[in-house]
């Protein structure tokens, strides 16, 4: 008589198991049957809370995925995984990384992001085979002083932490290609940053930088630089040395001028200068021959340089909310321009040469002081022409008329002439979503007081007079908070939890701590 042999007895040589998104509460027992052969185990996006002792007998593992669970402890037995190459324990509830992690000598890729960690173990720099390390959003306050011993690192992600400085040894990471320091509390960038000659991507957004070191110009291989949401008042002339740069974001700073050296960035494709204090652009901007997107929103520009017409590849130009009183006729030289936004300026006329931008599909001139439009616009194949916030359709019906001052034929419609708005301080305007400035002149009041004015608002006013007479009649509907506010809330909760853990010990009742954190979240 023949008996059916269970499938797992027929095949004990299993190298990979994928149990992602299976609502697992415990590690499945059958996994241990393949301990001698299992090299890849993916248990991401489940409800695991602990890793049993038997789990660390899977010593052949080379790739382990445990992200998006509820794991509360990473035991010292992690040292058993001496062949582990990839480890992902991101977005769990792990309060610390054991010092024994140093025994995982083969580890090359590690992600500890989104855990309530405040530090990395001192032994961490012994993992000298690491090439990619992600420790984003863990409330990290400092890096090990010997972080430079990780000399094989190519990618280091430290976003959304509480770092205030960088250790000197960081610049020993000579193979580093990607460094993400966004949304920390860094005040100074060391001059030695210029020694990271292989760096391709550098993210410094959302810090407290007031200047960039001259040595940043040594980064000849840099492709992407983001220094938005800082306190920069000037850029060093040496920025002209970033000859490989294709993406440059300097939004939400305090810049009043841009150095002429910007014109040497011949490969630059995207340049974002919105929400600064620029009153003019250098003529050298026209030498950025590969520029496709130029964002100038919310500055103090009175006009655009004539050299703007040399940007033959420019497809998106946004200069909303400036003080533009005129446009150069050379704007027509932007032969690839598809979207041109100059909303909320002080323009009284558009140059007829705009029609030479034959690829133009969207033209937004709402909120200006235009009396009419040039007849030449009829030659364009526009898909949208915005003249007013109250415009219900992207295109309108126009009539021809004669300009009494010049005798030229012009275009007019029911929304022309535009009504001039009363002079208003730009800084007093409510900011809208991602365009809201984090660096405007404001006092250092508590976040809770400041956040009310940072989110966008929809107002319903009968008229200005009624508003002055009875301010309480104004209905304001406020939008969802900017993600930055939500992140600050999260940090507040995490800090409270860390304080409670320190007071009660890590083995205290976690449910009680979480309950307290939930109360804080509700109050915030």
From Swiss-Prot:
Span list, region Disordered: 464-485
UniProt lineage: Eukaryota, Metazoa, Chordata, Craniata, Vertebrata
Domain of life: Eukaryota
This protein's record includes keyword Protein transport: no
Gene3D superfamilies in alphabetical order: Ribonuclease Inhibitor (3.80.10.10)
Coiled coil (UniProt feature): 456-512
LRR repeat positions: 11-34, 35-58, 60-81, 83-105, 107-126, 127-149, 150-172, 173-196, 198-218, 219-242, 244-264, 265-288, 290-310, 311-334, 336-356, 357-380, 382-405
Keywords in alphabetical order: Coiled coil, Cytoplasm, Leucine-rich repeat, Membrane, Phosphoprotein, Repeat
Location within or outside the cell: Cytoplasm; Membrane
Pfam families in alphabetical order: LRR_14, LRR_8
Modified residues (Phosphothreonine): 480
Entry membrane topology: Peripheral membrane protein
GO cellular component labels: cytosol; membrane
Protein name: Leucine-rich repeat-containing protein 1
Gene: Lrrc1
PANTHER family per UniProt: DISCS LARGE, LEUCINE RICH REPEAT CONTAINING 1
Species assigned in the record: Mus musculus (Mouse)
Subunit structure comment from the entry: Interacts with DLG1. May form a complex with DLG1 and ERBIN, where interaction between LRRC1 and ERBIN is indirect.
């Amino acid at each position: 008589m023949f008996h059916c042999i269970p499938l797992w007895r027929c095949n004990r040589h299993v190298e990979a198991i994928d149990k992602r998104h299976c609502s697992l509460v415990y590690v499945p027992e059958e996994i241990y049957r393949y301990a001698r052969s299992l090299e890849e185990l993916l248990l991401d996006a489940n409800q695991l809370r602990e890793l049993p002792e038997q789990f660390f007998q899977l010593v052949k593992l080379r790739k382990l995925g445990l992200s998006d669970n509820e794991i509360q402890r990473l035991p010292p037995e992690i040292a058993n995984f001496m062949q582990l190459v990839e480890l992902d324990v991101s977005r769990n509830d792990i309060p610390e990384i054991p010092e024994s992690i140093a025994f995982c000598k083969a580890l090359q890729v590690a992600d500890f992001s989104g855990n309530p960690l405040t530090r990395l173990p001192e032994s961490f720099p012994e993992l000298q085979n690491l090439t990619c390390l992600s420790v984003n959003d863990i409330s990290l306050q400092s890096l090990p002083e010997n972080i430079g011993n990780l000399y094989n690192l190519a990618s280091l992600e430290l976003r959304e932490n509480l770092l205030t400085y960088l250790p000197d040894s960081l610049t020993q990471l000579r193979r580093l290609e990607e460094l993400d320091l966004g949304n920390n509390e860094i005040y100074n960038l060391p001059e030695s940053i210029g020694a990271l000659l292989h760096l391709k991507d550098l993210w410094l957004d959302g810090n407290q930088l007031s200047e960039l070191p001259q040595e940043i110009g040594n980064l000849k291989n840099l492709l992407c630089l983001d220094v938005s949401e800082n306190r920069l008042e000037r850029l060093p002339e040496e920025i002209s040395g970033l000859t490989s740069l294709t993406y440059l974001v300097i939004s939400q700073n305090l810049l009043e001028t841009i150095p002429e050296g910007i014109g040497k960035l011949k490969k630059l494709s995207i340049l974002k200068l919105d929400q600064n204090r620029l009153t003019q652009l250098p003529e050298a901007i026209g030498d950025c021959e590969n520029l496709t997107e130029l964002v100038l929103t919310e500055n103090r520009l009175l006009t655009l340089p004539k050299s703007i017409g040399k940007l033959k590849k420019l497809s998106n130009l946004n200069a909303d909310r400036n003080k533009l009183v005129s446009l150069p006729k050379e704007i027509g030289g932007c032969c690839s321009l598809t979207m041109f936004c100059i909303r909320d300026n002080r323009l009284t006329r558009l140059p007829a040469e705009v029609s030479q931008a034959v690829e133009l599909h969207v033209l937004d001139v709402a909120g200006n002081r235009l009396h009419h439009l040039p007849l030449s616009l009829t030659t364009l194949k526009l898909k949208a022409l915005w003249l007013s916030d109250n415009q219900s359709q992207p295109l309108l019906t126009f009539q021809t008329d004669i300009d009494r001052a010049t005798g030229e034929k012009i275009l007019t419609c029911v929304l022309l002439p535009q009504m001039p708005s009363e002079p208003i301080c730009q800084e007093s305007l409510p900011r809208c979503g991602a365009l809201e400035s984090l660096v405007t002149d404001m006092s250092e009041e508590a976040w809770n007081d400041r956040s009310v004015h940072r989110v966008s608002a929809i107002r319903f006013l009968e008229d200005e007079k009624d508003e002055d007479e009875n301010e309480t009649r104004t209905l304001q509907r406020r939008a969802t908070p900017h993600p930055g506010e939500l992140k600050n809330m999260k940090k507040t909760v995490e800090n409270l939890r860390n304080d409670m853990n320190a007071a009660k010990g890590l083995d205290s009742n976690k449910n009680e701590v979480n309950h307290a954190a939930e109360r804080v979240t509700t109050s915030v």
